[in-house]
């Protein structure tokens, strides 16, 4: 069986990986000449199902828990399993209790325990939540690593050139926000981020700063570099970061550690995340085309589960008529 995967974002590459492991022949096409630099490129890369459960459906936790092991296997050495630290300014301590009431998988930590986890935050926060079972990765390194591994597994990539779908037995469409307008109910949610560089701060894990209006996070990358994100704005505009978002990011970083005030802003970016009305992804099939889309802010967390479901679709022996226009609904039942 010959399968075409459309898209080289996280959904496309994870789908290609799961499919090729079933023994089928996989080819990947990308409309751009270079691998996708859409929402996946600007992602936080937090593999944090318990933290995300605070504001997401139970399916995000249920299906996201396997993501750490999946990424560890697919991209060896890139997953950092140091957990997540959630903190809040003293005036917003009630936000910690609210956050804790909506999820699980954490333990309360006091000022001394926070200092033990993150020495550079010693004396800055009186209490917090520590999620030991979570992790993170650098999305850009993960995408590059997965692309290279797929090449070694015999997957062919077609970049920036039209490809005839007719010779393929199945097509797996993972085109993300590019499919908005072509897939019913799919919308775009803008996310903004920036990168800071400073040798004065060291963090071992993502730090989430709670705020009543806009909670933000700081994710360590290579030594001395940090990704700060991310907004969720109901628009499909992928223009430059707004002044308001920039100020909120910088204020949040300064609240975590004052040394960020002297950090260099080395990059800003925006991406449009594809999302359905309930903010849950779905895997659907129409004829011989399977659609993977709607990951919203959970691309790296939920793409492995979506990819596995797509591979199951391909391997099923149901007749074409039985599969036409079928929607799995697994995401909304979990």
Model features per residue range: what roles?
Residues 2-27:
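N-terminal Rossmann-like FAD-binding beta1-loop-alpha1 element of flavoenzymes
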Residues 55-65, 87-94, 129-145, 240-244, ...:
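Short beta-strand to alpha-helix junction loop
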Residues 17-21, 47, 78-79, 177-287:
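Active-site substrate-recognition segment that forms the wall
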Residues 263-334:
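C-terminal catalytic lobe of FAD-dependent flavoproteins
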Residues 129-166, 170, 174:
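Helical element adjacent to the flavin cofactor pocket in flavoenzyme catalytic cores
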Residues 44-117:
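Dinucleotide-binding Rossmann-like beta1-alpha1 core, especially the glycine-rich loop
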Residues 20-40:
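Glycine-rich FAD pyrophosphate-binding loop
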């Amino acid at each position: 069986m010959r399968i075409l995967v459309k898209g080289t974002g996280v959904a496309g590459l994870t789908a290609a990986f799961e499919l090729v492991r079933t023994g089928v022949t996989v080819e990947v096409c990308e409309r751009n000449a270079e691998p996708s630099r859409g929402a996946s490129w600007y992602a936080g890369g937090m593999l944090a199902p318990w933290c995300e459960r605070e504001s997401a459906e139970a399916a995000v936790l249920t299906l996201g828990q396997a993501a750490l092991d999946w990424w560890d296997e697919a991209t060896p050495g890139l997953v950092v399993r140091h957990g997540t630290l959630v903190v809040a300014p003293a005036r917003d301590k009630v936000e910690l209790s609210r956050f804790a009431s909506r999820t699980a998988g954490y333990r309360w930590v006091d000022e001394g325990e926070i200092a033990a986890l993150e020495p550079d935050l010693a004396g800055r926060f009186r209490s917090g939540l520590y999620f030991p079972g979570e992790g993170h990765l650098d999305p850009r390194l993960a995408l590059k690593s997965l692309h290279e591994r797929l090449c070694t597994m015999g997957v062919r990539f077609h970049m920036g050139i039209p490809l005839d779908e007719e010779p393929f037995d199945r097509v797996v469409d993972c085109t993300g926000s590019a499919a908005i307008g072509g897939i019913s109910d799919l919308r775009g949610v803008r996310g903004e981020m920036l990168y800071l560089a400073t040798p004065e701060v060291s963090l071992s894990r993502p730090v989430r700063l709670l705020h009543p209006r806009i909670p933000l996070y700081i994710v360590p990358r290579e030594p001395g570099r940090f990704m700060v994100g991310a907004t969720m704005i109901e628009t499909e505009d992928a223009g430059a970061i707004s002044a308001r978002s920039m100020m909120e990011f910088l204020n949040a970083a300064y609240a975590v550690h004052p040394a960020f005030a002297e950090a260099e802003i080395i990059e800003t970016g925006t991406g449009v995340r594809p999302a359905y009305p309930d903010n849950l992804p779905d895997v659907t099939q129409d004829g011989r085309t399977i659609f993977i889309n709607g990951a919203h802010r959970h691309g790296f967390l939920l793409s492995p589960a979506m990819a596995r479901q797509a591979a199951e679709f391909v391997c099923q022996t149901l007749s074409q008529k039985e599969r036409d226009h079928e929607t799995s609904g697994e995401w909304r039942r979990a």
